[in-house]
Amino acid sequence: MPLEQELMTEILGTPKDDFLASVRGALGRSTPSNPSPPYFRLEESLTDLEKMEQDLKERLLADHDQRINALVESARATAWNVNRFPNVEEATSYISDLLTTLGVQHAVRSNQPIFHQIPIDELLNDLSIESSVIDQIGAGQLSHTQARQKMIDADIGITGSDYCVVETGSVVILPRAGLSRLVSLGPPVHLAIVSPQEIVDTLDDVFLLRRLDYLRNGGDMGSYLNFISGPSRTADIEQTLVVGVHGPKEVHMVILG
């Protein structure tokens, strides 16, 4: 065995081919099975996707209240604390009571369009809660290190949503300037504010809209999608479930409309 291969074996353990051969032997197979065919490139044109988008919009316009009620049910099933309000005033009053009940002293929020509708900054100021907007990191306001520490030290992270999926009860957040995943992951409590127009039925709806963005924006669809389906959960080999290890242990969803 060449020296380089010996060193890699020592560092990484059993070589891949030997490991797979051992697995095949345990399964009673003498030769490798045929590999799965490669995934084909998505072939839909922009015109095709725009037609699908129009069909999606027409579907989402129907049964509006029923869809929101279904979202409330599915989100609660994944341990979201969900509340729906007919107007901004009632939503703001609820958020004020929530922040007071939680004893929040430090908050961080993202910079998303929803905060042009709901006066979160004014509310935080009225409650004497220290707050930071995680925006323009490294552009003269907050360095990456400062922003990260503020998000870790905060009692609550407040975000909007880009999509909210009825099928899974998930809030979906896209990467963008002015928004860090740590706003929803770092603090022990996450509050997501959802507008009705962000609610879709299925994950397929999300991926359709993402493919459209990909074609419309010159092939840039961002580096990740952040799906938030209730509080952080993890379990060990004995299936002991622990909440809040790798993210917030408490999540709240406020639906406007």
Predicted regions and their residues:
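The feature marks the mature, well-folded catalytic cores of soluble enzymes
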Residues: 1-257
